[in-house]
UniProtKB/Swiss-Prot annotation:
Disulfide bonds: none annotated. This is Serine/threonine-protein kinase TAO3. It comes from the Eukaryota. Residues 352-368 have a biased composition (Low complexity). Residues 452-502, 548-649, 754-875 form a coiled coil.
Length: 898
């Protein structure tokens, strides 16, 4: 994707497709920062006044800048609250994002710069209350601003407080990035990479620092190097309000915000219930403050405009002003401004605790507006009268007119054209009157100038922030990589466990199927054996019955023949009676044989049933033995599988333990490497800062040395003038004395007296000349000594300050190193405890599973034996009911059924 032409539809939807240069007109720069510039503009379609923040995403770190823009746009789109800046849209134009927001008059910081004194406590309370409401809204949606300061708290014409500049904001809470402005950073943000995450309470800390800023014009440690301030904040106690004249409620509020430990620090919602922001205050307190500030800004701009106008007139007519004229102009207007500022400004009695850099460098020599070059001979005339159009929030001048310089037509000399920079400045101050603001033109100019001058320091700080963020990204990337590796490892182990469980289940299913097949086979075999056994018995009984019938038949024949023989021998019995007796004897014999046959059949049936019953009992016992064998085989298989599973789990635990220790070592090694790199960078930055400060001091001393001859010449001229005055006095005295002596002495002695007086005059002048030379020499020596002493004192003070900052850096780095080592030790102990606890849980689980398996084994075997015992008992009871008696002792030949 080429930046500026996003191909991702989701990203493309964040930006409007229109050309911003056609929509927004009349752009005037009203602010400047590391991101770029903020402009006042008018929407040509709706005539709405807006603020345009231009952010370039070309050059170095293009992708990082682009991602920051996307993040800020997404963040702004989600905001909808009276105390957050209203988002209007974002446009892309030639690798520059035009972020359009509602226009505000300026920031709380601008008020401090305009009035050059702290705000009143009631004004601070009103601003803080509005900022807190915005923060509470952000924090309730798990968002963090991360760059709260007076410069990012804006005010609108009706006195509404707005949070702005969400370039450092975090959409998620907690976060762990090193972002923000050094002097306002909370300790946990500075230590974010070293100690972990932070939440919305970092904004509460920054708000407390902002309260001190509004009360003392500058945040704590502002006179310190920004890097050194970071080290100071990270390891020293929280700052407090310096003056005792503030109320206890305000002091308590600031102390409450600046609790060092985040857990003890209140949330933004808690602070909204604090007496400092809840107490009564005039409803128009901010509106009045804004109006006073606007009046003061207008007076400042008018003063600068009059200066530029006079320079224009002077350059047009006679060339540049002399230095003395400039000083007179400055002193005159300065005294007027001072008197007016005293009447307009805040009347708080607390003095400023630090010197504003703005008061030292309110230069107007680098204004960037362009004067219309088509009228080089025109001179602007300015009226002091102005009105504020409250409906359009635009301040308009009544009497801006142009007249032609008549002097230029009368004077035939070549005219001197005003310099372009002076024209630019004059038009800049004139054009500013077209919109309402509480930021003076000199402040805008100074911001631009400082942005250009402090590029090296800003690059160093941004490079340091970038390095910290890069380190954080490296740690997060490594953590994600290690987490992915651990997840992959655990997934692999889980698959192995699942594979083992599946294989075990399959093996048990196979075993169950095999046992079922064996049981079915045994059942079929038993049924076949039983059938064969029955057939054998029946065949034998059939054979026995045939033998028995044959025997009966033979016996019947024998008996019949025997009876016949007996009857034949008995001749006395009648034949009829013999026949009857033979028939009866046959019947008896047949009856006896029938009874014997029936008895044999009964014996055979009993034998058959009893032996079949006994065979069934043996078959059942054999089946029981097979069931016992099967359950023992199944339980043994389960135990073997469980033991294999336990061995695998122990192996997994050991491999996981080894991986965890290796990953912890890798993470800690990277963290220590990054800390060493960070400390090395911090040391290099500090050394570079020290060299820069020494160079600046050396340059200052060199300039003083170059300036020294001029100063000495002036002082020498002053001494010479004093000498000349003394000489004149002595000459007058000599003349008076000479006249007096000539009048009171005879004329004959005049020559001697004149010679004597001449010698005395020569002697005194010689002494005076000697004194003059001695004064010159003493003055030069004194000035040189004073200069050397002052420069040496400055060098000594600088060395002491730099040494203290270096010691502060060393202490900070030592603390960070000790904290990191302690953190690593805690992580190692935590890992050891986790590993030990996990191993104990695993061993307990193994023990419990083995006990459960043994219990299952005992219960299943017991249940099987009881079932089999009940089955045999039921079978034997049924056998008894069938009259078979005890079948256990039945052991006789199959043929012995009689």
């Amino acid at each position: 994707m080429r930046k500026g032409v996003p191909k991702d539809p989701e990203i493309a939807d964040l930006f409007y497709k229109d050309d911003p240069e056609e929509i927004f007109v009349g752009l005037h720069e009203i602010g400047h920062g590391s991101f770029g510039a903020v402009y006042f503009a008018t929407n040509s379609h709706t005539n709405e006044v807006v603020a345009v923040k231009k952010m370039s995403y070309s050059g170095k770190q293009t992708n990082e800048k682009w991602q920051d823009i996307i993040k800020e746009v997404k963040f702004l789109q989600q905001l909808k609250h009276p105390n957050t800046i209203e988002y209007k849209g974002c446009y892309l134009k030639e690798h520059t994002a035009w972020l359009v927001m509602e226009y505000c008059l300026g920031s709380a910081s601008d008020m401090l710069e305009v009035h050059k004194k702290p705000l009143q406590e009631v004004e601070i309370a009103a601003i803080t209350h509005g900022a807190l409401q915005g923060l509470a809204y952000l924090h309730s949606h798990c968002k963090i601003h991360r760059d709260i300061k007076a410069g990012n708290i804006l005010l609108t014409e009706p006195g509404q407080v707005k949070l702005a500049d969400f370039g450092s904001a975090s959409i998620v809470s907690p976060a762990n990035s090193f972002v923000g402005t050094p002097y306002w950073m909370a300790p946990e943000v500075i230590l974010a990479m070293d100690e972990g995450q932070y939440d919305g309470k970092v904004d509460v800390w920054s708000l407390g620092i902002t309260c001190i800023e509004l009360a003392e014009r500058k945040p704590p440690l502002f006179n310190m190097n920004a890097m050194s301030a970071l080290y100071h904040i990270a390891q020293n106690d929280s700052p407090t309000l310096q003056s005792n004249e503030w109320s206890d409620s305000f002091r308590g509020f600031v102390d409450y915000c600046l609790q060092k430990i985040p857990q003890e620090r209140p949330s933004s919602a808690d602070l909204l219930r604090h007496d400092f922001v809840r107490r009564d205050r005039p409803p128009r307190v901010l509106i009045d403050l804004i109006q006073r500030t606007k009046d003061a800004v207008r007076e400042l701009d008018n003063l600068q405009y009059r200066k530029m106008k006079k320079i224009l007139f002077q350059e047009t007519r006679n060339g540049p002003l002399t230095e003395s004229q400039e000083e007179e102009e400055d002193s005159e207007h300065g005294s007027n401004l001072s008197r007016k500022m005293d009447s307009l400004g805040s009347n708080h009695s607390i003095p400023s605790m630090s010197v504003s850099t703005g008061s030292q460098s309110s230069s107007v020599s680098s204004m960037q507006e362009v004067l219309d070059e088509s009228s080089p001979e025109l001179v602007m005339m300015h009226s002091d009268e102005s009105t504020v159009n409250s409906t359009s929030s635009v301040v308009q001048k009544k009497d801006h007119v142009f007249i032609r310089d008549e002097v230029g037509h009368r004077d035939r000399r070549p005219e001197v054209r005003p310099t372009q920079s002076v024209q630019n400045q004059a038009l800049h101050y004139r054009n500013r009157e077209r919109f309402a603001t509480i930021k003076s033109a000199s402040l805008v100019t100074r911001q631009i100038h400082e942005h250009e001058q402090e590029n090296e320091l800003r690059e160093q700080m941004s490079g340091y922030k970038r390095m910290r963020r890069q380190h954080q990204k490296q740690l997060i990337a490594l953590e994600n990589k290690l987490k992915a590796e651990m997840d992959e490892h655990r997934l692999k182990l889980q698959k192995e466990v699942e594979t083992h469980a599946n294989n075990s289940s399959i093996e048990l299913e196979k075993l169950a199927k095999k046992q079922v097949a064996v049981m079915e086979k045994e059942a079929k075999t038993a049924a076949a054996d039983e059938k064969k056994f029955q057939q054998q018995i029946l065949a034998q009984q059939k054979k026995d019955m045939a033998t028995f019938l044959e025997s009966q038949k033979k016996q019947y024949k024998l008996c019949k023949e025997k009876i016949k023989e007996e009857m034949n021998e008995d001749h006395s019995t009648p034949k009829k009676e013999k026949q009857e007796r033979i028939s009866k004897h046959k019947e008896n014999l047949q009856h006896t044989q029938a009874e014997e046959e029936a008895h044999l059949l009964s014996q055979q049936r009993l034998y058959y049933d009893k032996n079949c019953r006994f065979f069934k009992r043996k078959t059942m016992i054999k089946r029981h033995e097979l069931e016992q064998q099967n359950i023992r085989e199944e339980l043994n298989k389960k135990r073997t599988q469980k033991e294999m599973e336990h061995a695998m789990l122990i192996r997994h635990d050991e491999s996981t333990r080894e991986l965890e220790y290796r990953q912890l070592h890798t993470l800690q090694k990277l963290r220590m490497d990054l800390i060493r790199l960070q400390h090395q960078t911090e040391l290099e930055n500090q050394l570079e800062y020290n060299k820069r400060r020494e160079r600046e001091l050396h340059r200052k001393h060199f300039m003083e040395l170059r300036q020294q001859p001029k100063n000495l010449k002036a002082m020498e001229m002053q001494i010479k003038k004093q000498f000349q005055d003394t000489c004149k006095v002595q000459t007058k005295q000599y003349k008076a004395l000479k006249n007096h002596q000539l009048e009171v002495t005879p004329k004959s002695e005049h020559k001697t007296i004149l010679k004597s007086l001449k010698d005395e005059q020569t002697r005194k002048l010689a002494i005076l000349a000697e004194q003059y030379e001695q004064s010159i020499n003493e003055m030069m020596a004194s000035q040189a000594l004073r200069r050397d002493e002052a420069q040496e004192a400055e060098c000594q003070a600088l060395r002491l300050q730099l040494q203290q900052e270096m010691e502060l850096l060393n202490a900070y780095q030592s603390k960070i190193k000790m904290q990191t080592e302690a953190q690593h030790e805690r992580e190692l102990q935590k890992l050891e405890q986790r590993v030990s606890l996990r191993r104990a849980h695993l061993e307990q689980k193994i023990e419990e599973e083995l006990a459960a398996l043994q219990k299952e084994r005992s219960e299943r075997i017991k249940f099987l034996l009881e079932r089999q015992e009940r089955e045999i008992e039921t079978f034997d009871m049924e056998s008894l009911r069938m009259g078979f008696g005890n079948l256990v002792t039945l052991d006789y030949p199959k043929e012995d059924y009689r």
